Amino acid sequence: MVATRLTRLPEYLFADLEKKIAEKTAAGRDVINLGIGDPDLPPPDSFTKSLQLHAADSDAHFYSSSRGDAGVRKAIAKYFKGRFGVELDPDSQICVVLGGKEGLSSLGRAFVNPGDSVAAPSPAYPVYAQGVATLCDGKVQTMPLTKENGFLPDLNLAEGAKMLFVNYPNNPTGAIATEFFWQSLQDFADTHPETVVCHDHAYSEMTFGDYVAPSFLQYTKNAVEMHSLSKVFNATGFRIGFCVGRADYIAALVKAKSQIDSGAPLMIQRAMADGLAGYRGTEPPKEVVEIRKIYGERRAYTEKALRELGLDVIESPATFYVWARVGDDELPFVQRALDHDIVVTPGRGFGQEGVGYIRLALTQPLDRIKLAMQRLG
C-alpha cells in the first residue's frame, strides 16, 4: 500500500528514542534525556514578546509566500552582511524555510531525480541520506568522517553526485572545519557545476571561546547555505530558518516549496527578523551570549566527566553535542545508560561510521547532567 521509498527508510532515530523515553516516564522513572538536541532553555523574552506583538499584526492571519515575507528577507540580508560580510539580494538569494529539516528536504525535491546520487557524510544528520536521497528515490554516496581525518570528508568521494551536503560546526561530532577544507570545498563547488553544494549551518551561532564560525558563502557564490533559529534562540518548535545563496538554486527551492507549503506564519518570520536585528555586526545580542555561556559550561563539565569515566572524548569549541568513543560497539553502553534511566544516542543512528560512538545532547540543566554522570560512574 505505502510507497516503496518508505519501506527503504529506517525508523527515524529520534522517534525511537522518544518511544523509549515515553515508556520509562510512564513507568514513573526519573529519566535524564541526553539523547535529543531539543533545548531545555526557553526562547529569550525578547523573542517571545516579538512573537506576541506580531501575532496582532493586521496581516498576521494571511498566507505568507513560499519565498518568505519581503521585509523579513531584507532583515536577513542585513544580518548576513553584518555577521558574515556577505551581500545577498533579498529578492533572489534568500528563502525563508520552516526550519532546517523542511528546507533540506525541499532542496532535495528541487534537485534530486530518481537514481541520482547524494553525497552525504557519515556520521551525519540523518535527513541528508534519508530525507533527501531516499525520499527522492536517489542513492547515497557516503563520505566517512573519522577521528583520523578530523571528521572532514574526502571530497573525491563526492564526484558525480547531484548534491553534496556538509555541516560545520558539525552534528553529531561537534567538529569544525579547517581553512584548508573550506578552500578545498570552494574549489569543488566552483569546478563541479553538476553538483549542488549545500552547507547546513544550523550551529553557526553555537560556538564557545574565541571561535567564530564562518559562512561558506564567504568563499564562493556557487552554493546554498541553510540557517536555523532552532538552536541559537532555543526555538525548535517554532520551525523557522532561512536558506541563502546562489540565485538559481534558491529559485528552484522556492518552486518546490510552492507545491508543499505557503510559507512560515508571518508572526514567526517577523520574530526571527527582530531576533537577527539584535546582532551588531559579528557581535551577538546579549541573550545569545548568555545562551552560549550556559552551554559552554555544560560542555566543559561533560567533556571532563566523560574523560574521567575513561571515554575517548572529541573536544570541540562548538555545538551542544559531545561525541565520544566507548569501544567497538556502543550499544552495550547505551543500554547500560538506559538501565540507569539515562538516554544517550547510539552513534550508528548517524551512519555506519558512528558505530562505537555515543552522542550526548547537553539539553538538560547542569545539575541533571551531573546526576547523569554520577549514575554512569
Predicted regions mapped to residue ranges:
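PLP-dependent class I/II
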Residues: V2, T7-Y12, L17-V31, D38-H54, ...
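A glycine-/small-polar-enriched, mobile loop at the entrance of the PLP active site in fold-type I
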Residues: G35-D38, L53-R73
